[in-house]
Regions:
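Non-transmembrane, membrane-proximal soluble domains of secreted or membrane proteins
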Residues: 3-7, 28-54, 76-310
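Polytopic transmembrane helical bundles with strong interfacial aromatic enrichment
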Residues: 9-11
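Alpha-helical transmembrane segments of integral membrane proteins, especially early/N-terminal helices
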Residues: 13-36, 63-70
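Alpha-helical transmembrane segments
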Residues: 53-67
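Central hydrophobic cores of alpha-helical transmembrane segments in multi-pass inner-membrane proteins
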Residues: 68-78
Length: 310
């Protein structure tokens, strides 16, 4: 091969690689945009930041996957040995340029992901302050120092396997009602084991630790009915430990408070109790499990059959 052919070959290789990288970037961008549709609706101020990070990581993952798959496919298609050729390949080993590339590229990607993730985590922390108290003795001090929010806490009480929400107005509910576009303050409390306070539409997942109180705040931004799930394996019926989260206008929220505070308390929502009763009727067979905690008394048991948006 003469010099001219060698130069043309290198130019063709560079053009081919550039075109392949360009196509990879386009497909990665399309996949990143598509990833938004895989997630539930965005219903809190935190949701867009989490979704953007997810899309960013999806795009990077797609670029790496397609790039590696493309190289493997190219080698399989165009660098195979001729038919019936059983000779050994050339003993090629070591390529400093290639080793530098495959060291620097992952390093750059990891640093980029770390910087972006840290930025998102900082933003989420600013949007929803979170503090863990190891004993209830520390809570009064916090409330004294934060009088503006002291009367706005909604106590989220988790049990095996039911949810209870106690409001500052002195009543409780099995469903969580909150006003749109207003910061809502929670105190997360567990009565038995570790539970997970998980609302996919809010992009919120917080462990609830027994013996501790965790204060948390968020701002819902979209009206609708969403789903609160127990994301921790808290026992046999943890998957049934779900309830609705209702985001409504300020007027509708206040109207619900005025009605609910006058209601007589009844047993709260407890799907696990129903399932455990059926188990006993069948002879209590299968893996051993503890009985569900008695349902809490609430002013509004809610409607478990209401349609929700994830």
């Amino acid at each position: 091969m003469n010099l001219k052919d060698n130069i043309n070959s290198k130019i063709s290789l560079i053009i081919g690689i550039t075109f392949a990288v360009f196509i990879d970037l386009i497909l990665s961008k399309l996949m990143a945009n598509w990833s938004y549709s895989w997630l539930p609706v965005q219903a809190s101020k935190a949701a867009p930041y989490v979704d953007n990070l997810f899309a960013f990581e999806t795009g990077i993952g797609t670029f790496i996957f397609l790039g590696c798959s493309g190289v493997i496919g190219w080698v399989l298609l165009f660098n195979r040995a001729p038919k019936y050729d059983e000779s050994y390949g050339e003993p090629i080993e070591g390529n400093v340029k290639l080793e530098i590339v495959w060291t620097l590229v992952p390093l750059f990607l990891v640093i980029a992901i770390a910087i972006y993730s840290t930025k998102v985590n900082t933003t989420l922390q600013n949007l929803g302050e979170k503090t863990k108290y190891d004993s209830q003795k520390e809570l009064p001090t916090y409330l004294d120092n934060n009088e503006a929010s002291a009367g706005r806490f909604i106590d989220v009480i988790s049990r095996q396997w039911s949810w209870e929400f106690k409001y500052p107005e002195g009543f409780s509910s099995s469903e969580l009602h909150i006003p749109i576009n207003e910061k809502v303050y929670f105190r997360l409390i567990s009565k038995d084991v570790i539970h997970g306070f998980y609302i996919p539409a809010f992009r919120l997942k917080q462990d609830i630790i027994p013996g501790s109180i965790i204060s948390y705040s968020l701002t819902p931004t979209r009206k609708g009915i969403y789903r609160l799930r127990d994301s921790m394996f808290s026992g046999a019926y943890f998957s049934q430990n779900q309830t609705n989260v209702i985001v409504e206008s300020k007027d509708a929220y206040q109207e619900w408070i005025n009605k609910t505070v006058k209601k007589v308390q009844v047993d709260g929502l407890n799907q696990a109790g129903f399932l455990y009763k059926k188990r006993l009727e069948k002879g209590d067979k299968g893996w051993a499990t503890i009985p569900p905690a008695p349902p809490p008394l609430v002013n509004d048991p809610g409607d478990p059959d209401s349609p929700h948006e994830g």
